[in-house]
Curated annotation (Swiss-Prot):
Protein name as it appears in the record: Adenine phosphoribosyltransferase
Subcellular location: Cytoplasm
Keywords linked to the UniProt accession: Cytoplasm, Glycosyltransferase, Purine salvage, Transferase
Similarity remark: Belongs to the purine/pyrimidine phosphoribosyltransferase family.
Organism name: Xanthomonas axonopodis pv. citri (strain 306)
HAMAP family the record matches: Aden_phosphoribosyltr
Swiss-Prot/TrEMBL catalytic activity: AMP + diphosphate = 5-phospho-alpha-D-ribose 1-diphosphate + adenine
Pfam families found in the cross-reference section: Pribosyltran
E.C. code: 2.4.2.7
Molecular functions per Gene Ontology: adenine binding; adenine phosphoribosyltransferase activity; AMP binding
Involved pathway(s): Purine metabolism; AMP biosynthesis via salvage pathway; AMP from adenine: step 1/1
PROSITE patterns: PUR_PYR_PR_TRANSFER (PS00103)
Keyword Ligase annotated: no
Length: 186
């Protein structure tokens, strides 16, 4: 059971109250960090549906072949958004989690590097995709997903995140010619 003395948030529910379902967890995953926890939102069907509807709205008339969802919570939002938009879903995973041949993109962390990958045959060249993740923080992972899409010669029509942490300036790492839409910003 989580120690909710570190949690901030409300239990209000309703069509316009879904942002209140995102709670702050202080000092997680390490001291000094305030983590935006979306799990209360995910567990509330009506509020989750409202959040997904808002995320999907800007893309409803955009022709898409697939949503690329970034591990791990980008899987949850990306798969649900793909269903909402009636298109396919392609997972973007941490290294070693996908069978078969993959494309790999390395990206910088504060101390060191990490990688993400996707199947090299996931989509045909020129497929139109939307990149989805839960949170835009420093922008490294989202930028790496853009790099994977470029390796496969996909057409990235945009990116969608549920939450943007503006103070971390992740948007500055994004491609200026590709729309990046955050449903909620802090």
């Amino acid at each position: 059971m989580t120690d909710c003395s570190r949690c901030a948030g409300t239990n209000t529910s309703g069509p316009n109250h879904w942002p209140e379902r995102i709670r702050d967890i202080v000092d997680f995953p390490k001291p000094g960090i305030v983590f935006k926890d979306i799990t209360p939102l995910l567990s509330d069907g009506p509020d989750f549906a409202s959040a997904l509807d808002e995320m999907a709205q800007p893309w409803r008339t955009t022709p898409l072949d697939a949503v690329l969802g970034i591990e791990a919570r980008g899987f949850i939002l990306g798969a649900a958004l793909a269903r909402e938009l009636r298109t396919g879903f392609v997972p973007v995973r941490k290294p070693g989690k996908l069978p078969g041949r993959t494309l790999i993109q390395e990206y910088a962390l504060e101390y060191g590097t990490d990688r993400i990958e996707m199947h090299e045959d996931a989509l045909p060249r020129g497929a139109r995709v939307l990149i989805v993740d839960d949170v835009l923080a420093t922008g490294g992972t989202l930028r790496a997903a853009l790099g994977l899409a470029a390796q496969l010669e996909l057409e990235v029509v945009g990116a969608a995140v549920l939450v943007e942490l503006q103070g971390l300036q992740g948007r500055q790492k994004w491609a200026n010619d590709v729309p990046l839409l955050a449903t909620l910003s802090y």
